[in-house]
Protein backbone atom coordinates (compact mmCIF):
# COMPACT_ATOMS: atom_id res chain seq x y z
CA UNK A 1 0.00 0.00 0.00
CA UNK A 2 2.80 2.41 0.92
CA UNK A 3 4.52 1.78 -2.42
CA UNK A 4 1.29 2.46 -4.32
CA UNK A 5 0.73 5.77 -2.51
CA UNK A 6 4.35 6.75 -3.06
CA UNK A 7 3.95 6.00 -6.78
CA UNK A 8 0.78 8.08 -7.01
CA UNK A 9 2.41 11.08 -5.28
CA UNK A 10 5.47 11.01 -7.53
CA UNK A 11 3.69 10.60 -10.88
CA UNK A 12 4.87 13.98 -12.14
CA UNK A 13 8.50 13.27 -11.34
CA UNK A 14 8.30 9.87 -13.01
CA UNK A 15 6.83 11.36 -16.18
CA UNK A 16 9.62 13.93 -16.37
CA UNK A 17 12.23 11.23 -15.88
CA UNK A 18 10.69 9.05 -18.56
CA UNK A 19 10.51 11.97 -20.98
CA UNK A 20 14.16 12.78 -20.39
CA UNK A 21 15.15 9.19 -20.93
CA UNK A 22 13.16 9.04 -24.15
CA UNK A 23 14.85 12.18 -25.44
CA UNK A 24 18.34 10.77 -24.85
CA UNK A 25 17.70 7.21 -26.05
CA UNK A 26 19.37 6.38 -29.37
CA UNK A 27 19.94 3.26 -31.37
CA UNK A 28 16.81 1.54 -30.04
CA UNK A 29 16.13 -2.00 -31.19
CA UNK A 30 12.82 -3.45 -32.39
CA UNK A 31 9.76 -2.33 -30.48
CA UNK A 32 8.75 -4.58 -27.61
CA UNK A 33 5.17 -5.85 -27.27
CA UNK A 34 2.76 -3.46 -25.60
CA UNK A 35 3.17 -3.63 -21.86
CA UNK A 36 0.39 -4.47 -19.48
CA UNK A 37 -1.55 -1.25 -18.81
CA UNK A 38 -0.67 0.20 -15.44
CA UNK A 39 -3.45 0.30 -12.87
CA UNK A 40 -4.58 3.87 -12.25
CA UNK A 41 -4.58 5.44 -8.82
CA UNK A 42 -8.37 5.04 -8.74
CA UNK A 43 -8.42 1.42 -9.96
CA UNK A 44 -9.98 -1.08 -7.55
CA UNK A 45 -7.59 -3.04 -5.40
CA UNK A 46 -7.63 -6.80 -5.85
CA UNK A 47 -9.10 -9.22 -3.35
CA UNK A 48 -5.70 -10.24 -2.01
CA UNK A 49 -5.02 -6.65 -0.94
CA UNK A 50 -8.49 -5.97 0.46
CA UNK A 51 -9.30 -9.41 1.85
CA UNK A 52 -12.75 -9.10 0.25
CA UNK A 53 -13.18 -11.92 -2.27
CA UNK A 54 -16.26 -11.34 -4.47
CA UNK A 55 -19.32 -13.47 -3.68
CA UNK A 56 -21.02 -13.56 -7.06
CA UNK A 57 -23.75 -15.84 -5.76
CA UNK A 58 -24.71 -13.21 -3.19
CA UNK A 59 -24.82 -10.61 -5.97
CA UNK A 60 -27.13 -12.95 -7.89
CA UNK A 61 -29.49 -13.18 -4.91
CA UNK A 62 -28.58 -16.48 -3.28
CA UNK A 63 -28.39 -16.74 0.51
CA UNK A 64 -25.07 -17.58 2.10
CA UNK A 65 -26.46 -20.67 3.78
CA UNK A 66 -27.65 -21.96 0.40
CA UNK A 67 -24.24 -21.34 -1.13
CA UNK A 68 -22.36 -23.13 1.63
CA UNK A 69 -24.74 -26.07 1.44
CA UNK A 70 -24.32 -26.30 -2.33
CA UNK A 71 -20.53 -26.41 -2.03
CA UNK A 72 -20.67 -29.12 0.61
CA UNK A 73 -23.08 -31.24 -1.43
CA UNK A 74 -20.76 -31.01 -4.43
CA UNK A 75 -17.69 -31.86 -2.38
CA UNK A 76 -19.32 -34.81 -0.65
CA UNK A 77 -20.61 -36.23 -3.94
CA UNK A 78 -17.37 -35.85 -5.89
CA UNK A 79 -15.06 -36.93 -3.07
CA UNK A 80 -17.16 -39.33 -1.02
CA UNK A 81 -20.16 -40.25 -3.15
CA UNK A 82 -21.04 -43.49 -4.92
CA UNK A 83 -17.86 -44.75 -6.56
CA UNK A 84 -19.66 -46.18 -9.57
CA UNK A 85 -21.45 -43.01 -10.66
CA UNK A 86 -20.51 -40.02 -8.47
CA UNK A 87 -17.05 -39.96 -6.92
CA UNK A 88 -13.75 -39.03 -8.55
CA UNK A 89 -11.76 -39.34 -5.29
CA UNK A 90 -10.76 -42.93 -4.52
CA UNK A 91 -8.99 -44.10 -1.38
CA UNK A 92 -6.16 -46.52 -2.17
CA UNK A 93 -4.85 -47.95 1.07
CA UNK A 94 -1.76 -46.54 2.74
CA UNK A 95 2.03 -46.69 2.80
CA UNK A 96 4.70 -45.72 5.31
CA UNK A 97 3.81 -42.05 4.75
CA UNK A 98 0.11 -42.43 5.47
CA UNK A 99 -3.18 -42.83 3.56
CA UNK A 100 -3.22 -42.76 -0.25
CA UNK A 101 -5.93 -41.52 -2.62
CA UNK A 102 -6.22 -40.50 -6.26
CA UNK A 103 -8.52 -38.45 -8.48
CA UNK A 104 -9.79 -40.68 -11.28
CA UNK A 105 -10.53 -39.51 -14.81
CA UNK A 106 -13.27 -42.07 -15.23
CA UNK A 107 -13.83 -41.40 -18.92
CA UNK A 108 -10.17 -41.79 -19.88
CA UNK A 109 -9.43 -44.50 -17.33
CA UNK A 110 -6.35 -42.82 -15.86
CA UNK A 111 -5.04 -40.56 -13.11
CA UNK A 112 -3.78 -37.17 -14.27
CA UNK A 113 -1.49 -34.64 -12.64
CA UNK A 114 -4.07 -32.01 -13.60
CA UNK A 115 -6.82 -33.71 -11.59
CA UNK A 116 -4.57 -34.57 -8.66
CA UNK A 117 -3.46 -30.95 -8.36
CA UNK A 118 -7.07 -29.74 -8.72
CA UNK A 119 -8.08 -32.13 -5.96
CA UNK A 120 -5.38 -30.75 -3.68
CA UNK A 121 -6.38 -27.16 -4.43
CA UNK A 122 -10.03 -27.91 -3.67
CA UNK A 123 -9.02 -29.67 -0.44
CA UNK A 124 -6.88 -26.80 0.83
CA UNK A 125 -9.58 -24.24 0.01
CA UNK A 126 -12.13 -26.31 1.97
CA UNK A 127 -9.73 -27.05 4.85
CA UNK A 128 -9.75 -30.79 4.13
CA UNK A 129 -6.24 -31.75 5.22
CA UNK A 130 -6.81 -35.52 5.22
CA UNK A 131 -7.85 -35.60 1.57
CA UNK A 132 -5.07 -33.17 0.63
CA UNK A 133 -2.38 -35.31 2.24
CA UNK A 134 -3.71 -38.56 0.78
CA UNK A 135 -3.73 -37.14 -2.77
CA UNK A 136 -0.26 -35.66 -2.36
CA UNK A 137 1.09 -38.92 -0.95
CA UNK A 138 -0.28 -40.85 -3.96
CA UNK A 139 1.12 -38.28 -6.41
CA UNK A 140 4.61 -38.38 -4.91
CA UNK A 141 4.53 -42.17 -4.62
CA UNK A 142 3.26 -43.00 -8.11
CA UNK A 143 3.70 -39.95 -10.36
CA UNK A 144 6.86 -38.11 -9.27
CA UNK A 145 10.03 -38.91 -11.20
CA UNK A 146 12.99 -39.16 -8.81
CA UNK A 147 15.54 -40.74 -11.17
CA UNK A 148 18.16 -38.04 -11.97
CA UNK A 149 18.89 -39.73 -15.30
CA UNK A 150 15.29 -39.57 -16.52
CA UNK A 151 14.22 -36.67 -18.78
CA UNK A 152 11.21 -36.08 -16.49
CA UNK A 153 13.33 -35.87 -13.33
CA UNK A 154 11.76 -33.48 -10.83
CA UNK A 155 8.36 -33.52 -12.53
CA UNK A 156 5.16 -35.56 -12.36
CA UNK A 157 3.97 -37.99 -15.02
CA UNK A 158 0.87 -36.37 -16.45
CA UNK A 159 -0.98 -39.68 -16.95
CA UNK A 160 -0.71 -42.96 -15.04
CA UNK A 161 -2.94 -45.97 -14.47
CA UNK A 162 -4.82 -46.35 -11.21
CA UNK A 163 -2.15 -48.85 -10.10
CA UNK A 164 0.52 -46.18 -10.62
CA UNK A 165 2.04 -47.56 -13.82
CA UNK A 166 2.90 -44.61 -16.12
CA UNK A 167 0.98 -44.16 -19.35
CA UNK A 168 3.03 -41.06 -20.25
CA UNK A 169 6.04 -40.29 -18.07
CA UNK A 170 6.39 -36.68 -19.20
CA UNK A 171 4.68 -33.77 -17.42
CA UNK A 172 1.85 -31.42 -18.33
CA UNK A 173 2.98 -28.19 -16.63
CA UNK A 174 -0.42 -27.10 -15.33
CA UNK A 175 -0.23 -29.97 -12.86
CA UNK A 176 3.04 -28.70 -11.42
CA UNK A 177 1.65 -25.15 -11.27
CA UNK A 178 -1.38 -26.19 -9.23
CA UNK A 179 0.68 -28.55 -7.05
CA UNK A 180 3.10 -25.75 -6.14
CA UNK A 181 0.41 -23.21 -5.34
CA UNK A 182 -1.70 -25.67 -3.35
CA UNK A 183 1.38 -26.62 -1.31
CA UNK A 184 2.15 -22.98 -0.50
CA UNK A 185 -1.46 -22.46 0.58
CA UNK A 186 -1.33 -25.62 2.70
CA UNK A 187 1.78 -24.33 4.47
CA UNK A 188 -0.08 -21.16 5.38
CA UNK A 189 -3.32 -22.87 6.44
CA UNK A 190 -1.90 -25.85 8.30
CA UNK A 191 1.76 -25.13 9.02
CA UNK A 192 4.76 -27.26 8.18
CA UNK A 193 4.81 -31.03 8.48
CA UNK A 194 7.63 -33.51 8.10
CA UNK A 195 9.12 -35.15 5.03
CA UNK A 196 6.78 -35.00 2.08
CA UNK A 197 4.32 -33.05 4.23
CA UNK A 198 6.76 -30.19 4.72
CA UNK A 199 4.56 -28.29 2.31
CA UNK A 200 6.70 -25.19 1.82
CA UNK A 201 9.89 -27.15 1.24
CA UNK A 202 8.10 -29.36 -1.27
CA UNK A 203 6.68 -26.32 -3.09
CA UNK A 204 10.06 -24.63 -3.28
CA UNK A 205 11.81 -27.74 -4.57
CA UNK A 206 9.24 -28.03 -7.36
CA UNK A 207 9.34 -24.31 -8.10
CA UNK A 208 13.12 -24.42 -8.45
CA UNK A 209 12.95 -27.42 -10.76
CA UNK A 210 10.32 -26.04 -13.12
CA UNK A 211 12.45 -22.93 -13.63
CA UNK A 212 16.04 -24.09 -13.29
CA UNK A 213 16.24 -27.77 -14.11
CA UNK A 214 18.95 -28.45 -16.66
CA UNK A 215 18.38 -30.44 -19.88
CA UNK A 216 18.45 -34.20 -19.44
CA UNK A 217 18.69 -36.75 -22.25
CA UNK A 218 17.65 -40.26 -21.40
CA UNK A 219 15.38 -43.17 -22.13
CA UNK A 220 11.62 -43.09 -21.68
CA UNK A 221 8.91 -45.56 -22.61
CA UNK A 222 8.73 -43.70 -25.94
CA UNK A 223 12.45 -43.95 -26.59
CA UNK A 224 15.29 -41.51 -26.04
CA UNK A 225 14.19 -37.98 -25.28
CA UNK A 226 15.69 -34.69 -24.18
CA UNK A 227 13.69 -32.52 -21.81
CA UNK A 228 14.30 -29.07 -20.36
CA UNK A 229 12.66 -26.87 -17.74
CA UNK A 230 8.94 -26.00 -17.76
CA UNK A 231 9.34 -22.23 -18.28
CA UNK A 232 11.17 -20.72 -21.22
CA UNK A 233 13.64 -18.19 -19.78
CA UNK A 234 13.70 -15.99 -22.86
CA UNK A 235 9.94 -15.93 -23.47
CA UNK A 236 9.25 -15.98 -19.71
CA UNK A 237 6.37 -18.26 -20.50
CA UNK A 238 5.13 -21.70 -19.50
CA UNK A 239 5.88 -24.38 -22.05
CA UNK A 240 3.36 -26.79 -23.54
CA UNK A 241 5.76 -29.58 -22.59
CA UNK A 242 9.48 -29.75 -21.77
CA UNK A 243 10.47 -32.28 -24.44
CA UNK A 244 12.63 -30.44 -26.97
CA UNK A 245 10.46 -31.29 -29.96
CA UNK A 246 7.55 -29.29 -28.54
CA UNK A 247 9.14 -27.03 -25.92
CA UNK A 248 8.86 -23.85 -28.00
CA UNK A 249 5.06 -23.87 -27.74
CA UNK A 250 2.58 -23.11 -25.00
CA UNK A 251 -1.01 -23.69 -23.91
CA UNK A 252 -3.13 -20.67 -23.00
CA UNK A 253 -4.86 -22.57 -20.21
CA UNK A 254 -1.49 -23.23 -18.55
CA UNK A 255 -0.96 -19.48 -18.08
CA UNK A 256 -1.75 -18.72 -14.44
CA UNK A 257 -0.63 -15.14 -13.68
CA UNK A 258 -2.61 -15.14 -10.42
CA UNK A 259 -0.38 -17.97 -9.20
CA UNK A 260 2.82 -16.36 -10.47
CA UNK A 261 2.01 -13.32 -8.32
CA UNK A 262 1.78 -15.67 -5.34
CA UNK A 263 5.17 -17.18 -6.18
CA UNK A 264 6.62 -13.68 -6.55
CA UNK A 265 5.65 -13.06 -2.92
CA UNK A 266 6.43 -16.33 -1.16
CA UNK A 267 8.81 -18.18 -3.48
CA UNK A 268 12.62 -18.14 -3.38
CA UNK A 269 13.82 -14.54 -3.25
CA UNK A 270 16.23 -14.93 -6.16
CA UNK A 271 13.42 -15.87 -8.55
CA UNK A 272 10.73 -13.41 -7.51
CA UNK A 273 11.54 -10.88 -10.23
CA UNK A 274 11.18 -13.62 -12.85
CA UNK A 275 7.72 -14.59 -11.58
CA UNK A 276 6.57 -10.98 -11.54
CA UNK A 277 7.64 -10.64 -15.14
CA UNK A 278 6.07 -14.00 -16.05
CA UNK A 279 2.75 -12.69 -14.75
CA UNK A 280 3.05 -9.62 -16.99
CA UNK A 281 3.97 -11.79 -19.96
CA UNK A 282 0.98 -14.07 -19.43
CA UNK A 283 -1.38 -11.09 -19.28
CA UNK A 284 0.01 -9.85 -22.57
CA UNK A 285 -0.24 -13.38 -23.97
CA UNK A 286 -3.95 -13.57 -23.18
CA UNK A 287 -4.51 -10.20 -24.86
CA UNK A 288 -2.79 -11.48 -28.02
CA UNK A 289 -4.25 -14.99 -28.04
CA UNK A 290 -7.89 -14.05 -27.38
CA UNK A 291 -9.81 -13.55 -30.62
CA UNK A 292 -10.66 -9.85 -31.15
CA UNK A 293 -14.39 -10.57 -31.49
CA UNK A 294 -15.08 -13.70 -29.44
CA UNK A 295 -12.19 -13.68 -26.91
CA UNK A 296 -11.84 -17.43 -27.54
CA UNK A 297 -8.31 -18.82 -27.23
CA UNK A 298 -6.86 -21.93 -28.88
CA UNK A 299 -5.98 -25.06 -26.97
CA UNK A 300 -2.32 -24.87 -28.04
CA UNK A 301 -0.36 -21.81 -29.08
CA UNK A 302 2.95 -20.35 -30.15
CA UNK A 303 4.80 -17.96 -27.88
CA UNK A 304 3.67 -15.03 -30.04
CA UNK A 305 0.01 -15.73 -29.29
CA UNK A 306 -0.89 -17.37 -32.59
CA UNK A 307 -2.64 -20.76 -32.58
CA UNK A 308 -0.57 -23.91 -32.94
CA UNK A 309 -2.04 -26.83 -34.84
CA UNK A 310 0.00 -29.66 -33.35
CA UNK A 311 0.92 -32.27 -36.00
CA UNK A 312 -0.76 -35.06 -34.04
CA UNK A 313 -3.78 -32.89 -33.13
CA UNK A 314 -4.47 -30.18 -35.72
CA UNK A 315 -7.74 -29.27 -34.01
CA UNK A 316 -5.65 -27.85 -31.16
CA UNK A 317 -5.78 -24.53 -33.03
CA UNK A 318 -9.47 -24.31 -32.07
CA UNK A 319 -11.24 -23.46 -28.82
CA UNK A 320 -11.59 -26.85 -27.16
CA UNK A 321 -11.41 -28.54 -23.77
CA UNK A 322 -8.13 -27.03 -22.54
CA UNK A 323 -9.12 -23.55 -23.67
CA UNK A 324 -12.27 -23.48 -21.54
CA UNK A 325 -9.98 -22.56 -18.66
CA UNK A 326 -8.29 -19.51 -20.21
CA UNK A 327 -11.01 -17.04 -19.21
CA UNK A 328 -11.10 -18.56 -15.73
CA UNK A 329 -7.37 -17.93 -15.42
CA UNK A 330 -7.37 -14.29 -16.51
CA UNK A 331 -10.55 -13.54 -14.51
CA UNK A 332 -9.14 -14.95 -11.27
CA UNK A 333 -6.02 -12.89 -11.92
CA UNK A 334 -8.15 -9.76 -12.15
CA UNK A 335 -10.16 -10.67 -9.05
CA UNK A 336 -7.07 -11.33 -6.93
CA UNK A 337 -4.67 -8.66 -8.17
CA UNK A 338 -6.60 -6.17 -10.40
CA UNK A 339 -3.50 -5.26 -12.39
CA UNK A 340 -4.67 -5.50 -16.02
CA UNK A 341 -7.95 -3.80 -17.04
CA UNK A 342 -7.86 -5.62 -20.38
CA UNK A 343 -9.09 -8.68 -18.50
CA UNK A 344 -12.40 -6.95 -17.77
CA UNK A 345 -12.97 -6.28 -21.46
CA UNK A 346 -11.93 -9.80 -22.46
CA UNK A 347 -14.44 -11.37 -20.08
CA UNK A 348 -17.16 -9.01 -21.31
CA UNK A 349 -16.30 -9.94 -24.89
CA UNK A 350 -16.31 -13.67 -24.16
CA UNK A 351 -19.63 -13.58 -22.31
CA UNK A 352 -21.21 -11.44 -25.03
CA UNK A 353 -20.22 -14.09 -27.56
CA UNK A 354 -21.71 -16.97 -25.57
CA UNK A 355 -24.84 -15.00 -24.73
CA UNK A 356 -25.39 -14.40 -28.45
CA UNK A 357 -25.04 -18.15 -29.05
CA UNK A 358 -27.91 -18.76 -26.62
CA UNK A 359 -27.43 -19.32 -22.91
CA UNK A 360 -29.06 -22.74 -23.02
CA UNK A 361 -27.75 -23.70 -26.43
CA UNK A 362 -24.11 -22.70 -26.80
CA UNK A 363 -21.75 -25.48 -27.71
CA UNK A 364 -18.47 -26.52 -26.12
CA UNK A 365 -16.18 -26.45 -29.17
CA UNK A 366 -15.65 -23.53 -31.58
CA UNK A 367 -13.26 -22.12 -34.10
CA UNK A 368 -11.65 -18.99 -32.71
CA UNK A 369 -13.90 -16.77 -34.83
CA UNK A 370 -16.99 -18.43 -33.40
CA UNK A 371 -18.05 -21.21 -35.75
CA UNK A 372 -19.61 -23.99 -33.61
CA UNK A 373 -17.89 -27.37 -33.81
CA UNK A 374 -20.34 -29.31 -31.64
CA UNK A 375 -19.77 -30.94 -28.30
CA UNK A 376 -23.11 -29.90 -26.83
CA UNK A 377 -23.32 -27.80 -23.71
CA UNK A 378 -21.12 -29.10 -20.90
CA UNK A 379 -20.97 -28.30 -17.21
CA UNK A 380 -17.23 -27.63 -17.41
CA UNK A 381 -17.62 -24.74 -19.84
CA UNK A 382 -20.68 -23.40 -18.02
CA UNK A 383 -18.48 -23.39 -14.91
CA UNK A 384 -15.52 -21.55 -16.39
CA UNK A 385 -17.81 -19.04 -18.11
CA UNK A 386 -19.30 -18.28 -14.69
CA UNK A 387 -15.84 -17.65 -13.26
CA UNK A 388 -15.31 -15.12 -16.07
CA UNK A 389 -17.86 -13.02 -14.17
CA UNK A 390 -15.13 -12.24 -11.63
CA UNK A 391 -13.68 -9.88 -14.23
CA UNK A 392 -16.71 -8.97 -16.36
CA UNK A 393 -18.61 -5.82 -15.42
CA UNK A 394 -21.61 -6.04 -17.78
CA UNK A 395 -24.96 -6.94 -16.16
CA UNK A 396 -25.03 -10.18 -18.18
CA UNK A 397 -22.33 -11.51 -15.86
CA UNK A 398 -24.92 -12.62 -13.30
CA UNK A 399 -26.78 -14.67 -15.92
CA UNK A 400 -23.64 -16.81 -16.23
CA UNK A 401 -23.46 -17.15 -12.45
CA UNK A 402 -27.09 -18.27 -12.32
CA UNK A 403 -26.44 -20.75 -15.13
CA UNK A 404 -23.74 -22.35 -12.97
CA UNK A 405 -26.10 -22.45 -9.99
CA UNK A 406 -28.69 -24.36 -12.01
CA UNK A 407 -26.24 -27.09 -13.01
CA UNK A 408 -26.45 -30.38 -11.09
CA UNK A 409 -23.29 -31.87 -9.62
CA UNK A 410 -21.71 -33.82 -12.50
CA UNK A 411 -22.11 -37.58 -12.38
CA UNK A 412 -21.65 -40.49 -14.73
CA UNK A 413 -18.98 -41.08 -17.34
CA UNK A 414 -17.75 -37.50 -17.74
CA UNK A 415 -17.84 -36.44 -14.10
CA UNK A 416 -14.08 -35.95 -13.70
CA UNK A 417 -13.30 -32.84 -15.78
CA UNK A 418 -16.77 -31.34 -15.52
CA UNK A 419 -16.82 -32.08 -11.80
CA UNK A 420 -13.45 -30.57 -10.97
CA UNK A 421 -14.19 -27.39 -12.93
CA UNK A 422 -17.68 -27.23 -11.41
CA UNK A 423 -16.45 -27.45 -7.82
CA UNK A 424 -13.63 -24.97 -8.37
CA UNK A 425 -16.12 -22.60 -10.02
CA UNK A 426 -18.43 -22.84 -7.00
CA UNK A 427 -15.48 -21.85 -4.81
CA UNK A 428 -14.46 -19.00 -7.09
CA UNK A 429 -17.98 -17.62 -7.44
CA UNK A 430 -18.69 -17.82 -3.71
CA UNK A 431 -15.53 -16.01 -2.65
CA UNK A 432 -14.17 -19.19 -1.07
CA UNK A 433 -11.21 -19.73 -3.42
CA UNK A 434 -8.54 -17.60 -1.80
CA UNK A 435 -4.84 -16.87 -1.90
CA UNK A 436 -3.58 -18.11 1.47
CA UNK A 437 -0.53 -15.93 2.08
CA UNK A 438 1.44 -14.95 5.17
CA UNK A 439 0.77 -11.45 6.45
CA UNK A 440 4.38 -10.45 5.89
CA UNK A 441 4.39 -11.54 2.23
CA UNK A 442 6.22 -9.16 -0.10
CA UNK A 443 3.66 -6.89 -1.76
CA UNK A 444 5.29 -7.50 -5.14
CA UNK A 445 6.33 -3.92 -5.77
What are the functions of these language-model segments?
Residues 2-13:
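Bacterial N-terminal signal peptides that target proteins for export
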Residues 29-44:
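Ser/Thr-rich, Proline-interspersed low-complexity disordered segments
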Residues 48-176, 182, 192, 347, ...:
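N-terminal carbohydrate-binding/catalytic regions of secreted carbohydrate-active enzymes
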Residues 136, 183, 200, 207, ...:
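Inward-facing hydrophobic residues that define packing positions of alpha-helical scaffold repeats
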Residues 181-192, 253-258:
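Hydrophobic alpha-helical segments with transmembrane-like composition
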Residues 363-445:
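C-terminal functional modules
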